[in-house]
Amino acid sequence: MIRRFTFQFGAAVVLFLCGGFLASEESRAEDIRFTSVPDIFNWNISNPQSGWEDALDWFFDRLQKEGPDFTLNAGDIMDARWWDDEAQVKRKTEEYWTGFKKRFDDRKMTIYLAPGDHEYGDDGGLKIGHIARAFGKQFTRLMGMPKNGPANHIGRTFFVRKGNLLVVTLDTFEDQGKRFGYTVGKEQLAWLEKTFKANRDAEFIIVQGHLPIVGPVRSKNSSASMLKGGANSGLWKLMVKHGVNVYLCGEHHRITVKKRDGIWQIVHGALWGTQTDLNYLRGSVRPKEMTLELLEFDVEYSGGYIGDHPHRGAKSKPRENVDLAAKTKSEGPRVTGALVLSVGSDGSVEVTKAAGWFEVKLPKKDTTPRK
């Protein structure tokens, strides 16, 4: 499906780029430049991981060059089916999560990470309240995220302000006692409304959370979870009320772009070690304008399967070796979607350019007011 879509929209993307899109190498020094890559890795990948490092060096080089200000990640960094006891959670997160974070720290890259279901032990961990709580404590302790969010999600829900851009990271999982729910609770919503009001002068607002809200979405190698309540949820209604522009999410390991109520929901990310067609997003923000691009590239796998994946079948694991496909090596990633949002004199946001994944059949002008 991805290849057919790319073929159909390839010409539109080329025309879009020729029409004046500013490639990252030509971006202005004052631009805010970032990338987004959810669901990497979604497997227990060590640092270093034999057979992976050349491909990862290539990819992290791109993230660092194209998004020097920060990288967004909407969760699921490891498989993390560590359900034995809290001691196992502590031991394994210290091994794998700190290794993941070190990849960014070694390059002096800033990452803003939202918890995915795998940051609570996957769906199985979310069903065991005390195990999920142990994961949450470790996330707060180890991952080093901003601690300006609500007390019950400290270090897991937070915001950052970069010039005219507000970026909010949410935890789409709530402690409900015996198990965790797939929702955003009242404490987060109250904090979120205060954050929106305190930053009402932001020209653009991006929110990231692991679970998509508006369906249906494409899905592969995923439990296909969605936020409870969908577009009728308190979260969606609050984002509409305060003029959120973009909601970034993952979970489904496929690309789906939807626009509803003035919000662009972008589901993306892919399963490294299993899927051969991978993707990421890059963006830039300057006064009155935000540009987003979706990029895809291909890899190849070989060898056996990486161990240390409890509660998995013999082949339900990542492959031992990852290599860039020949075309990826020679040509780099291909742009398969591009979007430019511009703020007009009346405060409304116009879709001034769109192509590929973003070419949805909707009116070009979004009159959702900026709050």
Language model features by range: what are they?
Residues 1-13:
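Bacterial N-terminal signal peptides that target proteins for export
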Residues 16-26:
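C-terminal segment of classical bacterial N-terminal signal peptides
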Residues 24-90:
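N-terminal active-site segment of His-dependent metallophosphoesterases
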Residues 39, 75-76, 116-117, 210, ...:
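Active-site glycine-centered loops adjacent to acidic/histidine catalytic or metal-binding residues
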Residues 42, 78-79, 119, 213, ...:
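Short active-site segment of divalent metal-dependent hydrolases/proteases
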Residues 47, 83-201, 224-229, 234-243, ...:
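Extended active-site neighborhood of metal-dependent phosphoesterases/phosphodiesterases
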Residues 58-70, 105, 110, 161, ...:
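His/acidic metal-ligating clusters that form di-metal
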Residues 294-304:
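Short, solvent-exposed aromatic-acidic interface loops
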